């Protein structure tokens, strides 16, 4: 079965940038796709996030079957509910989906702002995907109060060759980094 030694390091700098660094080494070949499941609401606890504005450096998202398992197809985002190429409000849509991140994203894989844009969260990683999950209440009339942002190698990569490599070979170390930064606008 082997032994996996995993380490998580948190590093905060003077620019209010938080790096989370995941490292792993195993005595046998295994899978390694660590991520965080952190929820954000930039206007306050229990407040509606539908007017938060989102931008994702992505042109494609993963198609899933009726069990939420990726089919292997990457679908164009343009002119769909998945099109966050430009900053715009989340709206009432429910999300529990994976976006394929572009390679030239210049430190902003994802940007989330408060409705008045007084606060901006940027998230980036050396990973090729991001899962965005609106805390989808069972009651469709209930408000969504948080957004989870999970930077990771694309889900189900072990079954889809072009989704990325999550195999951790025996006695090799893999390291991944996710960076979060919140900025307050001086103009708002």
Tell me what each language-model feature is:
Residues 1-188:
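An exposed, glycine/acidic-rich loop-and-rim segment of catalytic or binding clefts
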